[in-house]
Amino acid sequence: MALKITQVKGLVGTKPNHRANMESLGLKRIGHSVVKQDTPIIRGMVHKVRHLVTVEEVAGE
């Protein structure tokens, strides 16, 4: 199982650790999406920035 993570809000005014988290996920701009493996580490990173992203489960990978 994989997760499709899409950035839906900008990073202006966010905490530095949230910006670092988004960079680690590979998200750079609003509307940008990445597909990551569903692991506890990725789930934790998404949980920290859940107000900035949307998450969908996708089959494959």
UniProtKB/Swiss-Prot annotation:
Sequence similarity: Belongs to the universal ribosomal protein uL30 family.
Domain of life: Bacteria
Subunit structure: Part of the 50S ribosomal subunit.
Species of origin: Corynebacterium aurimucosum (strain ATCC 700975 / DSM 44827 / CIP 107346 / CN-1) (Corynebacterium nigricans)
Annotated protein name in UniProt: Large ribosomal subunit protein uL30
Any one GO CC term of the record: cytosolic large ribosomal subunit
GO biological process: one example: translation
GO molecular function terms noted in the UniProt entry: structural constituent of ribosome
